[in-house]
Amino acid sequence: MSNQKKRNFQIEAFKHRVVVDPKYADKTWQILERAIHQIYNQDASGLSFEELYRNAYNMVLHKFGEKLYTGFIATMTSHLKEKSKLIEAAQGGSFLEELNKKWNEHNKALEMIRDILMYMDRTYIESTKKTHVHPMGLNLWRDNVVHFTKIHTRLLNTLLDLVQKERIGEVIDRGLMRNVIKMFMDLGESVYQEDFEKPFLDASSEFYKVESQEFIESCDCGDYLKKSEKRLTEEIERVAHYLDAKSEEKITSVVEKEMIANHMQRLVHMENSGLVNMLLNDKYEDLGRMYNLFRRVTNGLVTVRDVMTSHLREMGKQLVTDPEKSKDPVEFVQRLLDERDKYDKIINTAFGNDKTFQNALNSSFEYFINLNARSPEFISLFVDDKLRKGLKGITDVDVEVILDKVMMLFRYLQEKDVFEKYYKQHLAKRLLSGKTVSDDAERSLIVKLKTECGYQFTSKLEGMFTDMKTSEDTMRGFYGSHPELSEGPTLIVQVLTTGSWPTQPAVPCNLPAEVSVLCEKFRSYYLGTHTGRRLSWQTNMGTADIKAIFGKGQKHELNVSTFQMCVLMLFNNSDRLSYKEIEQATEIPAADLKRCLQSLACVKGKNVIKKEPMSKDIGEEDLFVVNDKFTSKFYKVKIGTVVAQKETEPEKQETRQRVEEDRKPQIEAAIVRIMKSRKILDHNNIIAEVTKQLQPRFLANPTEIKKRIESLIERDFLERDSTDRKLYRYLA
């Protein structure tokens, strides 16, 4: 079969042409034209759309697509010109209604016509790249109605007038507005933008420019912001009701520019109502409104932040440099915490916990807290007050809150080592006097300090707690080996490691014989059980509980310092003693003795002895007797030593000197670490790196760094470069 010849088939063309009636196109078009008229005249109920579709189909099939297309355009144009005259003739409020009515009729007619001309749409128009029926119908409406001279301007003015009326409080037909403006959108984005949106935005800009000027002259800041917020809300609602969604960003930008951006500086600085007034008076609602409005404009929040920062720094500067407000350290710190709480609440409540404002708050507090050189001391005194008495009766959760607030202030300190120095002194007094209200709170704060600054910062503080525990064990051993002492006075000794505790010179004091004997027995016991140790008594740091019987047999237990005990025990053998006799018998230094006597004789309710003559100050000619008339409703009476809560100027200078001495080895260690790593480094870079490395503890003075470099050169840790004197080399 494969060998058979292939047969070729040929299809011949028709020998006779198909003849089309020369008047076919005109006749068919006339049928379609009449149908279009009937559709526009809303008289289409008797039409056969199947027949009309077939007629249009055949015209295209017989190459009369162009005639059909141009005829459709001409007929629709004619109808629209007539409709535009009817719309133009409408008066007053009926103008938009007539326009909307004719627009709806046109759309309905256009849908029917498009269905009839569907074949032309799919073939002829597609192949010739002409505009399809439906968009052409929209274009014709645009050109013959919307852009008709006598309608165009009137339409725009009517719409803008209605928007204006709505803005001043009149009620308008939003449904009609929505339909008419949707017409613009249906006609194309460019039509909506050019014929309505752009003029609308221009008119809105002018409206809000005038209104904002009226408001700024007549309203305070809070009211102005309320009106601005209301206008923004209204414009957003307006978009939702009858504008294109894309217009929201544009119209809100207009309101933001005219109402907020153009008046930012005047608003924040408005006298008696601006930002500072809001901050001072905790106007959270107004502050929140300002934040939400200003965040919408360029540099809005920067403006708010800068004004807040300026106010905070000025307020804080006054707070920490006012001598009156620095008299009480506890109140001083509490004011700082109150201000911090106040602005934390403002930032959380009104500013959405914005990190920009948190950072501004932190930088401001760091700035002004360090303006007062006594801030480290005062913060430590605040802690001391809380841990002595201020935490009684509050929950563990509240204790942690207070300690966290203290740590927050601590982080702001540039001289954390100064705080450490004071904190160690105050902790020592609390531990030795047994006056801390909570060991857990003490240890919790040390853990927080350790987390913040590292082990080195807290190692000595932890050593103090270790000594207290070791001392308890030592005392049990002492009394266990001396059972005969159980009947006499009880001695409790805390053995303190010199390196862990604040060093104080031993103050001379003649202890009463009963106590002195016990002390010697303890010394013998301790040195006998520990080799290579040395004990020195710190009597100025001790306390005593002594029982006293006054004139009419009143019995009290007096909690006193060791010095006060030494003075009071003298009155067991004498009814009357002079200042000189007490001084000679006790050998207590004059300044300490005067404070001691002042506490015993001059404090109301604690005056267990009387002085002659009566006065608040202690003189060297004074005489002292037991106050037989002393009474107290308490059996146990604590007699504190009259002492300034904060350091005196000489004490402050002494502490500062100790701090500076302690810094020297730390600076040298930092220099050596850096040079060991870098080998060669110039002077400026050493200063910068040492400052950065020591910043967590203190702000190193460049002059002191230079001195430490010189000291290290003298001791052959470093050497200067022979050619460049500002270059240093590390010597291994």
From Swiss-Prot:
Sequence ranges assigned to domain Cullin neddylation in this UniProt record: 662-724
Post-translational modification: Neddylated. Deneddylated via its interaction with the COP9 signalosome (CSN) complex.
Gene disruption phenotype: No visible phenotype under normal growth condition. Reduced sensitivity of the inhibition of hypocotyl growth in far-red light. Cul3a and cul3b double mutant is embryonic lethal.
GO molecular function annotation: ubiquitin protein ligase binding
GO biological process: positive regulation of flower development; response to red or far red light; ubiquitin-dependent protein catabolic process
Complexes and interactors: Interacts with CSN2 and RBX1A. Interacts with BTB/POZ domain-containing proteins BPM1, BPM2, BPM3, BPM6, BT1, BT2, BT3, BT5, AT1G01640, AT1G21780 and AT5G48510. Interacts with SR1IP1. Interacts with NPR3 and NPR4. Binds to NPR1; this interaction requires NPR3 and NPR4.
Family: Belongs to the cullin family.
Name listed for the protein in its UniProt record: Cullin-3A
Primary gene name: CUL3A
